[in-house]
Amino acid sequence: MAGLAASFGSGAMTNSITDLIESDCFLITGSNTTENHPVIASVVKRAITQRGAKLILADPRNIELAKFATVWLRQKPGTDIAWINGLLNIIIAEDLLDKEFVAERTENFEALKLAVAKYTPEFVESITSIPGGDLVKAAHLYAKAGAASILYAMGITQHITGTDAVKSLANLAMLTGNIGRPGTGVNPLRGQNNVQGACDMGCLPVNFTAYLQVANEEHRRKFEDAWGVSLNPKPGLTIPKIIEGADTGAIKALLIMGENPMMSDPDLAHVEHSLSKLDLLVVQDIFLNETGSLADVVLPACAWAEKEGTYTNTERRVQRVRKAVNAPGEARDDWQILTMLANKMGADWKYVQAKAIMEEINSVTASYKGITYERIADTGIQWPCPTLEHPGTPILHSAIFTRGRGLFSVTEYIPPAEQTDDQYPFVLTTGRILYQYHTATMSRRSQGLVSRTPEAFMEINPADAGELGIKNGEKIEVSSRRGSITLRADVRDRVDRGVVFIPFHYSEAAVNRLTITAIDPIANIPEYKVCAVKIQKCS
């Protein structure tokens, strides 16, 4: 989000899911779209099989989409900026750029041109292991397409250079004029059904709603006037900084809502140690998860079918959610719990229904001003929707970028924070699988899903497994400099030599006991996708 906001002025999917069918070429990277966003993957596949669209896939794993790819760029994990800058280099060197778009709608092109000059196919191959010829072919496919679309997810962002990698993708779209039209754009596929909505509503430590900045006096005054309070001008803390604060004693109490850091955060031993130092830990959730087990107080929340409200999905579509069943026991809507807590602490909040909160959102959020429960009763509306007469905005940046001109950012390849060595010779990358969801608080309660993927596993290349004497299905121990887990080996060529993959859904073999706490300095996202590990058979 920070990368797109810097480049375009808006950190969201530029296009709509339905108009992806009009793409002539897709560049998909950092996204196992078939397993993590299957509906979107079906649109991509239809464009390929029915319209003849081309697919450039950049992924270190042999995922299902590889069989649909015209070119598969199998990069080393953590080398994304190098190969993206390589594409930029080729497009500029071979005069494949959209000169009119660059001149009329962007700035800082000359600095970009100078910066990417060294990223020749040969130089990129030395970093990424992508054959130079494949990189050239990909550059031509993307630049010469009538409409080319970029899709990416957390495989791009969960690195110490994640923000810069997204800026590089934005550079690529602007360089070729692939923005603001059907079938084009830069499209982040969000990790959960309402991540976009949560960010829109200010669930980011630096922002109010609609990405107005906490540190900006004019922005802050707007919310002070609306709420009748004085607001702290200092931005809040990101999750890594919160855990750090708990460890140092700077943070004494913590309320965790709908989050499971004892599964989702890196270096879980450190997380557990830090949370244990709190004077008070309150967890608000629908099930007692691994984090809830450490809590002093647990507040029972409502599940999606038990409450009213809206979700804003990955294409910025605000959709209505209606209560279908009553919540069990003492479970309450999140807004009700927060209202009760606030009033206990001396506030005078008068919310009595979710609709009143939506009306407040309309009053302080320009991009949601024209979105009401009545208007989104059926199909939802895509923001920005500034008036009650406005139809919504399926495609962003058609005539002008949110920031005015699009900004070409200079980015450089920086190696991952942790490198392999003789003691820890394998690169571990992590992610999701089709049959489980995030920390599996909900999905592992489904026997149907559990039956498909009953236990934790690690993908390892057959050549590597052979050298270690490991057979498919055998128990193995995987260790990093931070911890160890035991799980089963899944021996197949889905990963390249020297790389292993473990999904993060399994509490009995929580892969985040291994991952590193290094973070992107801008977005503060941990580097979940690269750390060094060693592997041995269990005796």
Describe the function of each predicted region.
Residues Y142-K144, T420-D422, E527:
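Solvent-exposed loop and beta-edge segments used for protein-protein assembly and interaction
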